[in-house]
């Protein structure tokens, strides 16, 4: 299990990317959420209303206008060998545990599973302004994230790849070797999140 963390100011860009509306068409599924209104389809599956979710995230962010970048995006992936046992339930359990230990259990978040690459992974949009209007502590978040990933990987029996160095936080080598399509998805997401903040091509 490994996590890439990015920060931004556009909930719209992040949510639309995760829900498959930006970049190359993707197969995705909403598998979990917290603190936001959710619609359901006739089969009882999550059927999020995108604009309602965006409005909800933005409304909570306004509780603390000092936080200029309230969008936290977590791209969470696992070793390909875990795919056979990584059901939506197991993935959601691991993600919720990760968010709790990172301090994001008292805020809004949306968990979306993407099925367009060879490594099982999901994306999480979370509000850096919690339910009480406080900014969630992000001090040394990447170091803490790596430690938490290692703990959850061990506790839940996920697969480790070959290790390189302690500096790389013992993240599986196989999971670092992103496929071409995975890299395209990440670029599309980052561009989508940056567009609302850019005033010119140079800024972008």
Place the predicted regions along the sequence by residue.
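N-terminal nicking endonuclease/strand-transfer module with a His-rich metal-binding environment
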Residues: 1-204
């Amino acid at each position: 299990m490994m996590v890439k963390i990015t920060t931004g100011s556009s909930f719209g860009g992040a949510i639309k990317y995760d829900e498959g509306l930006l970049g190359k068409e993707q197969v995705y599924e909403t598998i979990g959420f917290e603190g936001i209104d959710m619609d359901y389809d006739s089969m009882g599956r999550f059927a999020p209303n995108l604009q309602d979710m965006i409005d909800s995230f933005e409304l909570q962010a306004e509780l603390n206008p000092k936080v200029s970048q309230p969008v936290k995006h977590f791209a969470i992936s696992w070793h390909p060998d875990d795919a056979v046992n990584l059901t939506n339930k197991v993935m959601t359990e691991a993600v919720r545990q990760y968010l709790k230990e990172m301090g994001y259990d008292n805020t809004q978040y949306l968990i979306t599973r993407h099925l367009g690459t060879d490594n099982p992974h999901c994306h999480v949009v979370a509000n850096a302004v919690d339910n009480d209007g406080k900014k969630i502590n992000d001090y040394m978040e990447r170091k803490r994230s790596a430690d938490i990933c290692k703990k959850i990987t061990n506790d839940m029996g996920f697969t480790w790849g070959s290790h390189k160095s302690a500096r790389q936080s013992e993240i599986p080598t196989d999971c670092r070797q992103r496929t071409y399509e995975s890299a395209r998805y990440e670029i599309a997401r980052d561009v989508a999140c940056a567009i609302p903040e850019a005033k010119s091509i140079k800024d972008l």
